[in-house]
């Protein structure tokens, strides 16, 4: 120990050393549970010593209400999007239904008073908008994110590679007609803060200069008051109860409505898909090896049939089915522009009480069963599951399902495009037909500000025009 230290400093250093000796790798604080090392202002996060990630937020487009040919075009483009990822890039799709700050949301749609005699009308119109808001999204904000990560020896090596991948992904989103933006470090921290504080109204106060002035870590600004993983199937995060589950994909045929049905649940939840592309050569070799093993088993069964004196063409049905499926999969990988992905599908359900949590989990399980799949609790892995739901592209759950490109793409992350603008001159134009969310827009800010009201006789065309005139006047 340096000789120039006073007695108090020596005691502090000894205390730190003693705590380090007692460290058994188990997190002792909420901050230690959060599995990343450092967040940089430009949005790059160092998760481990050699793993770096970035996050892109993307908007929705109209898919569920589109014509069949448009759906097919979007699906094919999404398949091409997934095929962009090679085995060196791990990526994660995050779909977050989080409670909104009701006060600030209502403030954004309220019509401000003016010094004239129409303030009672403004108050009544604002009250109507508030009622429409209440029957729409149930106080939830639904957002979508893509987080990708690579292995690199240093930040200097990781940064140009991440920026190159980011530019390619933004171009791929543009081809889909999707608006996408890269998140900086503060925005990523704000997102994680929103996840950890789903049950309270804690505001996110953070500035990079606070780190120098206070000596705190970025985790101190986002961590909840406590994590409690006391049971094997649930946990408590601050004042909210949660449960992590994984989707066991057992259906022979998947529907593109499956992910949308999960996201349509009117409760605070997070759906996460961790996707890792498998090297094409390795995937083909593995399948060929499997086919060889199946053929060997088939020959053994045929020999057994000959010895027993019955028809050698009679083999176990499972063996015939597996052989047919394996050869079909090999054909897809070799000649149909398919890749192999390892997918982990996680669902975080929450509730303000344990009973509300169980009700939400039951609803999610019913959705999975409707699509011939099973939603199973992550027994004794709740903490690992929760941390895998963070937008860090780090999967701590070893349960994976192999899927081809088209099977992975069936989880189409698009439902319907929302149109909600903040600003002093935004007007109310009704509710979204699919999501029931408010349509608030300033037409002057759109590419084409013109409008045309269409409808059958008596459907309310003149009422819509008068409502817009009134809204603009107020």
List the predicted regions and their residue ranges.
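Extended, folded cores of ATP/NTP-driven motor/assembly subunits in large transport
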Residues: 1-416
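Glycine-rich phosphate-binding loop of nucleotide-binding enzymes
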Residues: 61, 68, 76-83, 170, ...
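Glycine-rich nucleotide cofactor-binding entry segment
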Residues: 395-445
């Amino acid at each position: 120990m340096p000789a120039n230290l006073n007695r108090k400093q020596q005691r502090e250093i000894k205390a730190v050393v003693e705590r380090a000796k007692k460290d058994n790798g188990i997190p002792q604080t909420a901050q230690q549970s959060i599995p990343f090392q450092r967040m940089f202002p430009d949005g790059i996060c160092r998760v481990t010593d050699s793993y770096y990630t970035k996050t892109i937020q993307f908007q929705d487009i109209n898919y569920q209400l589109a014509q069949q040919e448009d759906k097919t075009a979007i699906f094919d483009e999404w398949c091409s999007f997934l095929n962009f990822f090679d085995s060196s890039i791990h990526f994660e799709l995050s779909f977050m239904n989080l409670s909104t700050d009701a006060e600030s949301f209502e403030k954004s749609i309220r019509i401000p008073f003016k010094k004239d005699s129409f303030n009672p009308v403004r108050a009544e119109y604002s009250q109507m908008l508030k009622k429409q808001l209440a029957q729409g999204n149930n106080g939830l904000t639904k957002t979508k994110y893509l987080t990708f990560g690579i292995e690199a020896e240093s930040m200097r090596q990781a940064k140009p590679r991440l920026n190159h991948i980011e530019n390619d992904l933004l171009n791929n989103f543009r081809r889909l007609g999707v608006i996408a933006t890269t998140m900086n470090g503060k925005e990523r921290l704000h997102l994680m803060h929103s996840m950890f504080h789903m049950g309270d109204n804690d505001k996110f106060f953070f500035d990079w200069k606070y780190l120098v002035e206070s000596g705190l870590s970025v985790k101190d600004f986002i961590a909840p008051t406590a994590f409690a993983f006391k049971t094997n199937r649930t946990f408590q995060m601050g004042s909210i109860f949660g449960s992590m589950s994984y989707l066991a994909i057992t259906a022979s045929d998947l529907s593109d409505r499956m992910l949308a049905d999960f996201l349509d649940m009117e409760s605070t939840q997070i759906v996460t898909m961790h996707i890792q592309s498998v090297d094409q050569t390795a995937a083909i070799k593995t399948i060929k090896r499997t086919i060889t093993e199946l053929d060997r088993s088939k020959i053994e069964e045929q020999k057994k049939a000959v010895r027993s004196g019955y028809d050698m063409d009679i083999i176990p049905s499972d063996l015939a089915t597996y052989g047919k499926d394996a050869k079909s999969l090999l054909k897809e990988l070799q000649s149909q522009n398919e890749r192999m992905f390892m997918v982990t599908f996680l669902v975080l359900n929450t509730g303000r009480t344990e009973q509300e949590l169980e009700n939400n989990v039951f609803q999610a399980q019913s959705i999975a069963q409707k699509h011939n799949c099973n939603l199973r609790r992550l027994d004794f892995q709740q903490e690992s599951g929760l941390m895998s739901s963070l937008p860090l592209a780090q999967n701590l759950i070893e349960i994976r399902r192999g899927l081809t490109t088209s099977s992975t793409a069936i989880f189409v992350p698009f439902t319907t495009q929302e149109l909600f603008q903040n600003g002093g001159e935004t007007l109310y134009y009704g509710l979204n037909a699919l999501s029931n969310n408010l349509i608030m827009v300033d037409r002057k800010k759109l590419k084409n500000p013109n409008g045309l009201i269409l409808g059958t006789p008596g459907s309310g065309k003149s009422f819509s025009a008068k409502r817009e005139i009134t809204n603009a006047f107020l």
